[in-house]
Amino acid sequence: MDYKDTLNLPKTSFSMRANLVRKEPEQLKKWEEMDLYKYVQKNREGAPLFVLHDGPPYANGNIHVGTALNKILKDFIIKYKTMQGYNAPYIPGWDTHGLPIEHRVASELGEKAKELSKSTIRKKCRKYAEKYVKIQREQFKRLGVRGDWENPYLTFDPKYEASVLKVLSKLVKSGNVYRTLKPIYWCTSCETALAEAEVEYHDHKSYSIYVKFQDKNKPNRFFVIWTTTPWTLPANVAIALNPNFDYCEVKVKDEIWILAEGLLEQAMKAMGIESYEIISTKKGSEFEGEVAQHPFMNRDSVIVMADYVALDAGTGCVHTAPGHGEEDYGTGLRYRLPVISPVNDQGIFTKEAGKYAGLFVFDANPIIVEDLRKSGHLVGEGKIEHSYPHCWRCKNPVIFRATEQWFIDVDKNDLRQKALSEIEKTEWHPSWGQNRITAMVQDRPDWCISRQRSWGIPIPAFRCQDCGESILDGKVIDHFAGIVEEKGTDVWFEWSESDLLPEGYTCPKCGSKNLKKQEDILDVWVDSGSSFEAVVKVMDELRFPADVYIEGSDQHRGWFQSSLLLSVGTEGVAPFKSVITHGFINDEQGRKMSKSLGNAVDPQEINNKYGAEILRLWVASSNYQEDIRISMNIIQQQIENYKKIRNTLRYLLGNLSDYSPQDSVPYEELLELDKWAIMKLHKLIRDVTRYYDRYEFYKVFQSILKFIITDMSAFYLDIIKDRLYVEGKTSPERRSAQTVLFEILVALNKMLAPILTFTSEEVYAHLPEAARNYKTIQVENWPEYKEEYIDSSLEERWEKLINLREDVLKALEIARAEKLIGNSLDAKVTLQIRSKDIDEIVRQYSREFIADLFIVSQVEFAESVEGFNGEYAVVKVDRAEGEKCQRCWKYSIETGADPELPDMCPRCVAVLRKYGSDYEL
């Protein structure tokens, strides 16, 4: 007879196959129809506020896997905090100004770009940015990220631009903004100044030359310098020595050369000089004020002192050109040296460079070297591969060039020290982030905030045509900000000066009305760095300072730092209470993603092939505080992990199809094994909550997966299967298990909800109506950890039983391999327990209970047994005694004792006698 209809087999419409690629868009549509973001916010009205402020991605191209990682991490935090009872708004934003967009637009326009007005270029840039905001918005939504997508913040929005100008105005009024001629990074290809955050370092092959400068007063004496930038020699005005180093006067043939003693041997070897003699040694300070002759310009080169001169390379005599170097410039200020920078915006030498006028600086290198060789000033040459700054956008090498620019003085009003103090008050995850940004802020130069481009917020500066004064006045900025709020910044390039200036405004220096607007724009890091003012302070649903900023580790010198300096400079405090940093993404071998290696992974491809849920699981499984690895192989591993999670959720649902929360059994009446499972669940809730609080999502993932695989699938669910399927449908034994399964399902689904946002919603829809308080799981309350369920003696006892079970499972596996048994229920095991502790525990339970624990038909105990030699017991496996029950498949010598049910064991007979009305027999 087929007894299938008398068993409580799992039943659920929750499918085994996830079909994520089809189901996820359907879920997105449901969320859209219910206006998910508004619904969640309405249900958290009046709750404590938690503000994660979105660092704006750049509106240029499709999202890549790094952008996806960032947005998914933010979504984990927002969804967890919401379920924790917080009102956690999420206003996504986009960085929409700047060189990358202008560069793309110019590339598309080709030669035509040069003929167009700035106003026209700006309109095309806006259109380009708008296009990619729309594209990226859909791509982020596809990842399951919840946010106010209909009302994002955009840095080209007039109100946002006006807020940025207000930040600038405050800094101008406090005296933190100045204009000067100073060497800065300059991209000759993009024709603009660059900030440190816009420079990338790549390996670059450079000249390495040694040049002698003749002493003007002692014609046979020479200062020997070393440089890797021959093109900067036309701007040389000095040679720097360290006042504290010893310098040797060395005889080489008939000449006396001056070099640092600590570099003498190394330098002579590099120059190929084998024969030389040290004549005398002096401190560097003794040479101060001496004068050398420039090797090819009709100009003096003064000997100056500088503490930064080091003994790591070169000669200890450092070629100094204040127009082409930050340290050189500082030395030039101290010695009042001229700042010469004979290079135009395109990197072409001007007539000030003499015979090299008209040459591109890097093209001039070999010519200058050859001229030095011919004149006899070149005493050594070679090539060196070293780390050199390149433009972040066009990837070409940049130069250091002195130009007139606007700067934020990071030391005025103790801005640097205040920023360092705020860094100390901020919580950094991981903790090394604090040291990293501290070092960067300590060592950073003043911030060059002007750019010579079109697409950005104009700096509302004017130049007086009568006295030449550059004017950047807080009153003028405030007036212009008022216009911008209504009209946007395009008006700067379209309106006349009289329309842009406050009525009756005159030059503060000479009183002239003859003022001409300047066309520099603000560094985009000022745009995005002002978001604390333009978004966090302005929006009613947010609060300043924000609780969390989370971005990639490159933002220590980017958005974290620009936001910090601007906020401290205008508000006196950091814009964030804590900062989370994530690493970069590499391939499986730890190599950087690149087109040339063909190892880039496209998030859209993963979404379309496997579903966004798999990408989200990959993010959760990765320790994002380090560099993270991804490949299709790694994605396949996450597909397997997803299946394990989904199958467990499905199994739980299947065994609860006839259960309602009102059927629950009180804790005191639960079976002991069920109490153990509840305890394990609550330990998981405790640990997972702690990991979410610390933003350690990979530990959340590991803990949940271990719980599912080890505690549930391999142990608890395996053991209770018999009780669930075979005991009476409404029996206390089965209801005890179901009570626990229900609590596990609800709590587990909630703990997974921030990560598996689509799957948890699908599970939620399959829960009994009484267990669903909202239209979405995203508003449910986080599972509550209950200390009273933690019983250390119970845990200790069961740990020993589990250890014994491991020995039995190994013995059963051997018996199965030897074809002694097929299913474990075919077995009877006899145990010789070695451990007195375990023996005492086992004796407290019935043999039937222990047999159920091992999933065998019978258990016996003996003083001496021959069999598998386990760690805790010797285990002998035999064929079970008696006949197989056709309902539960256990063997019993009493099977068939009831003539009415001749192929059933007494337990199954009793179940059907008592609960027969529950089944269709």
Swiss-Prot record:
Cross-referenced PROSITE patterns: AA_TRNA_LIGASE_I (PS00178)
InterPro entries hit by this protein: aa-tRNA-synth_I_CS, aa-tRNA-synth_Ia, Anticodon_Ile_BEm, Ile-tRNA-ligase, Ile-tRNA-ligase_type1, Ile-tRNA_ligase, M/V/L/I-tRNA-synth_anticd-bd, Rossmann-like_a/b/a_fold
Residues binding ATP: K595
Positions contributing to L-isoleucyl-5'-AMP binding: E551
Organism phylogeny: Bacteria, Thermotogati, Thermotogota, Thermotogae, Kosmotogales
Official protein name in the record: Isoleucine--tRNA ligase
One GO cellular component term: cytosol
Motif 'KMSKS' region in this chain: 592-596
